[in-house]
Amino acid sequence: MKTIFLICLLINVNDVKGSAFSFSTAFGTLHDPHLPSKCYGGDLSESLKSGVNDIVIVKQSDDAFKSTPFQARVGKLSNWKTLFKSREGKLAKLYVNNIRALPDVNLVLSDSGSVFIHRPRSIASCLFTNDEMQNMALDGERNDGLLVVADLNIELKFQIFVFNQNDRLVVTDIDGTITTSDVGGFLGGSIGVGVEQPRVVEFFDKVDFNGYKVLYLTARPMAFDGLTREYLFETLQDVDGNPPDFFRYSLPKGPLFMSPISAEKAISADAEIMKLSTLTSIINLFDLKEGVIYGAYGNKNSDTESYLKSGIKGDNVYLINEQSNIVNVATGNITSYKVQSQMINEYYPKL
């Protein structure tokens, strides 16, 4: 592994010679005045692994579309082609529901592997325009997205969700909130070990059944999007229920938002800043911002802070502790996923 990292560093140094970028640190913080600084949390450093976030589109009162940023990274260590070839300037193709989308729009990789939208006579961006989204083959609420970089043998799968102004959202962290611990949950979930909180799948299944859109927000870097999607949307599907009904439950297949910064930076990054930025980008898609997020679940103070600072009322914010007790941030009332599942119509009245 050490040899591979050495090769990567040598290649990156050569790649940036004579370009607009500058190479400044061990992994390289690449600076280009033509790239927007906020698209990836201000991080344009080297991407070692590939990953992509889902997109949420919200239909506006005038029928226009607005969306969260398009965030995708192609990592240097993804395969032999990415290892030995420069990624700078490579073109990507976008497919929506298996149909080529936006053939006249250039999706271009930066030298560090981040994907940007390039338009004539315009600065690079990570936001699609209304016209571009209207011309995607969107069909219903949940749509299959695929980013293909043919020159590098890269395919990244994600989802595009289309919501309406009257939709109400429930946000949840993953590690320590859906799983029983941060590290143990991540490691166990990545190999399919049963590490989920008691009755958590049943609870979110019922939240979804009552008409709320469940969003997953995690400080995990996008480099782990494949493992995370597999755990949430494959492992935690059709899970055995509990007596007396023994119904089977599944986690709702909602939008997944992970840290857009590189895996190396994500280790030491402030999770509160990332989550607050993501929450704000989602809430700002709605005309009436107050009450858009009807419930928010986490297990750390940073989760609570990001929820409250985004404008979510304390009455709707819940913190789960190591004993799987759920504490309401405003009232201090203690419940559990089991209790909230049994009283689902009181906590989340049907929409």
State where each predicted segment sits.
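Short, ordered coil/turn segments that flank beta-strands lining enzyme active or ligand-binding pockets
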Residues: 96-97, 165, 174, 322
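Core catalytic machinery and nucleic-acid-binding channels of phosphodiester-processing enzymes
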Residues: 142, 156-158, 202-210, 223
